[in-house]
Amino acid sequence: MLPKNAIEKIQANVSKPCFWKSLSPGQTWKSKSMRIIPEDFVRRTRGAFEHRVVFSVRWENSWQLWLEREKNELFMIEEDWNEFVDDNHLGPNDNLFIKHDETMNLEVQIFKNNGVEIIDVPLGVEPETEPFHPTPKKPHKETTPASSFASGSGCSANGGTNGRGKQRSSDVKNPERYLLNPENPYFVQAVTKRNDVLYVSRPVVQSYRLKFGPVKSTITYLLPGEKKEEGENRIYNGKPCFSGWSVLCRRHNLNIGDSVVCELERSGGVVTAVRVHFVKKD
């Protein structure tokens, strides 16, 4: 644990609600007690979050953690918390300083017991470990599942021909027929329970050598009937993604299991829009 004077120095100029997490004897970072969000912190944020929080760290990675209440205590869901612990290789000498930013967003700083702050990806952390699956010769008859996204992704996709990247399959036959421009990058998106943002998988990014705009810059969803909706470029768990996806799913009555073809449009080599093609059920 950090010395008291170090804690006071770090908190000296902090006016927003905050709290610390560090290990006590007999605890590990995956102990249930480590998943508790202090009730005092919840009260001071005045209901800014209820169902989930988003942890953001210095190197612009973010983790979405869903919440559940047991009796009078608010817990982060075990799967989400454990992912955050594993991704950051938290150990007995680590201390978390968690500060409310806005609404559900919490800023997390990681300090060692000697007071040194971790300001870059912890050694050995690989933001995304999905393997790259080369596209098979008959992509419309074969599907090769890849490892699932991190908790909260709500995304699965497969690729097409010409070496296109591929993730979990949505079993969409001949997705290229939906494309406005056959040369554009694309992937197939399956709607799942957790669909807050639209992720672009590592295989797709690598296959097309995709580039994205700055974090929080605008991305446009192009919809049938020349309709448009806007989202933002984000990075969660080291993965590029776009906000606004859950709103789009609700507005267009997409249900869990439905699939869409996401065609990426670029300007100057940078992804600027996602053309959304609703897949007709055969």
Swiss-Prot record:
Enumerate the residue ranges of region (Disordered).
Answer: 127-178
PROSITE patterns recorded:
B3
| Superkingdom field | Eukaryota
Q: Which UniProt keywords apply?
A: DNA-binding, Nucleus, Transcription, Transcription regulation
Species = Arabidopsis thaliana
What is this protein called in UniProt? B3 domain-containing protein At5g25475
**Subcellular localization:** Nucleus
One cellular-component annotation, GO: nucleus
Q: Which residues bind DNA?
A: 20-114
Q: Output the lineage of the source organism.
A: Eukaryota, Viridiplantae, Streptophyta, Embryophyta, Tracheophyta
Q: Which Pfam families match?
A: B3
Signal peptide interval: none
